[in-house]
């Protein structure tokens, strides 16, 4: 790799690390090309990305970013998964690791917080931002629905009483 290409790779990685909210580091030794493509497509579908680069270049790119602490994890054949959503990359990585034993999660970082393997798994078990928004909207709409049901309930009861009285009168 030429010096200019290395510099461009470092700048690209640095820009990625500056804008990401979470990074997951994993070993991928022994994965087939098809498995790596599957990982990339799953990450892309979740709004995350996967980068494989030389560890030395990645360590240089980490300098001056919030995720600088994951530099110690960059040993051997490593892949770095990043996402803006704090749950997307960890969730896909953990699910992929369950299906592929050769994909081993080493740790990660969320902002300036360093995560070990258990931290990444805990982060993956949290609901995504969209799921949380859905629950919040559901909680906000529920009281309005109950009020609407309560205001229509007395009218419905009166209508049933009148209907019962009318059918009783017809029967007599």
From Swiss-Prot:
<dbReference type="InterPro" id="IPR043141">
    <property type="entry name" value="Ribosomal_uL10-like_sf"/>
</dbReference>
<keyword id="KW-0689">Ribosomal protein</keyword>
<dbReference type="InterPro" id="IPR047865">
    <property type="entry name" value="Ribosomal_uL10_bac_type"/>
</dbReference>
<dbReference type="GO" id="GO:0015934">
    <property type="term" value="C:large ribosomal subunit"/>
</dbReference>
<dbReference type="InterPro" id="IPR001790">
    <property type="entry name" value="Ribosomal_uL10"/>
</dbReference>
<comment type="similarity">
    <text>Belongs to the universal ribosomal protein uL10 family.</text>
</comment>
<dbReference type="GO" id="GO:0070180">
    <property type="term" value="F:large ribosomal subunit rRNA binding"/>
</dbReference>
<dbReference type="GO" id="GO:0006412">
    <property type="term" value="P:translation"/>
</dbReference>
<comment type="subunit">
    <text>Part of the ribosomal stalk of the 50S ribosomal subunit. The N-terminus interacts with L11 and the large rRNA to form the base of the stalk. The C-terminus forms an elongated spine to which L12 dimers bind in a sequential fashion forming a multimeric L10(L12)X complex.</text>
</comment>
<keyword id="KW-0687">Ribonucleoprotein</keyword>
<dbReference type="InterPro" id="IPR022973">
    <property type="entry name" value="Ribosomal_uL10_bac"/>
</dbReference>
<dbReference type="Pfam" id="PF00466">
    <property type="entry name" value="Ribosomal_L10"/>
</dbReference>
<protein>
    <recommendedName>
        <fullName>Large ribosomal subunit protein uL10</fullName>
    </recommendedName>
</protein>
<dbReference type="InterPro" id="IPR002363">
    <property type="entry name" value="Ribosomal_uL10_CS_bac"/>
</dbReference>
<comment type="function">
    <text>Forms part of the ribosomal stalk, playing a central role in the interaction of the ribosome with GTP-bound translation factors.</text>
</comment>
<keyword id="KW-0699">rRNA-binding</keyword>
<keyword id="KW-0694">RNA-binding</keyword>
<dbReference type="GO" id="GO:0003735">
    <property type="term" value="F:structural constituent of ribosome"/>
</dbReference>
């Amino acid at each position: 790799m030429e010096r200019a290409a290395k510099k461009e790779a470092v700048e690209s990685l640095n820009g990625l690390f500056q804008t990401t909210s979470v990074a997951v580091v994993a070993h991928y030794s022994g994965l087939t090309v098809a498995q790596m493509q599957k990982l990339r497509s799953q990450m892309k579908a979740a709004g995350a990305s996967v980068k494989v680069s030389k560890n030395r270049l990645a360590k240089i790119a980490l300098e001056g970013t919030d995720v600088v602490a994951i530099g110690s994890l960059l040993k051997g054949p490593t892949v770095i998964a990043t996402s803006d959503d704090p749950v997307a990359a960890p969730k896909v990585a953990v699910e992929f690791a369950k299906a592929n034993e050769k994909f081993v999660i080493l740790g990660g970082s969320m902002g300036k917080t360093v995560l070990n393997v258990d931290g990444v798994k805990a982060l993956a078990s949290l609901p995504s931002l969209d799921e949380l928004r859905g629950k919040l909207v559901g909680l906000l709409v529920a009281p309005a629905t109950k009020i609407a049901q309560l205001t229509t309930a007395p009218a419905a009861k009166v209508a049933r009483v009148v209907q019962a009285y009318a059918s009783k009168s017809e029967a007599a």
